[in-house]
Amino acid sequence: MILKRATYKAIKYACLKFHYAKSVPVNVFGYSVFNEEKEWCGVVLFGTGANHNMGNPYKLKQGQIVELVRMALNGKQESTSKALSIALKLIKKDLPLCQLIVSYADVDQGHKGIIYQATNWYYVGTSLKDKKDGSFIVNGKRVHGKTLFDTLKKYGLKRNLENVQKYLDKNATEYVTKGKIKYLYPLTKDMRLMCESLSMDYKDIII
């Protein structure tokens, strides 16, 4: 298995075709994954994440922490955990200032984070449980808040439940998330010690 820096074209295609979110995150970089037959399998992506203050709890600045934001793969890879392991080694080489990687398993999608456990990440708890995440249930389907914002903005309307119900679906509701399981992967000795102090048992994860 070989990983190479991914082009934007590869990133866009993989995110739209291979990942359940069907969206392309901004400010990302990553690696294209090729199997032993030299077939392209998709991408592993990292970025600054949606929260620019995500390093604050760990006293890290931007550039010292990144988020694993997508593993958009088509299934042709021999091992997903191997692809991630190689990507983590490349991050350490390509971003020498980076000390910590954070990622989340989406409970709403039934994800527990098995891939993180297989590659020795530290489980540190669940965030955003029973919280509104800005998305809505419209006509029986979950729609991301940004998508609705773009739609309503065309008509000069604000993104709120009242407008969504008035113009899109009278029975629309705000979506309440089941939460995201948070994992940390340290790249330095100091961060490893910190992660060990925060770490919780995988057996404690309930979805």
Regions found by a protein language model. Name each.
Residues 18-21, 167-173:
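Short, P/G- and charge-enriched loop/turn segments at secondary-structure junctions
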Residues 15, 28-45:
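Conserved beta-hairpin
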Residues 196-207:
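Short, cationic low-complexity segments
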Residues 1-26, 39:
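Short amphipathic alpha-helix that is part of the acyltransferase structural core
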Residues 188-198:
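Short, charged low-complexity linker/loop segments at the C-terminal edge of domains
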Residues 5, 47-170:
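Acyl-donor binding region in acyl/amide transferases
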Residues 20-28, 34, 53-54:
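An active-site-proximal beta-strand-loop segment
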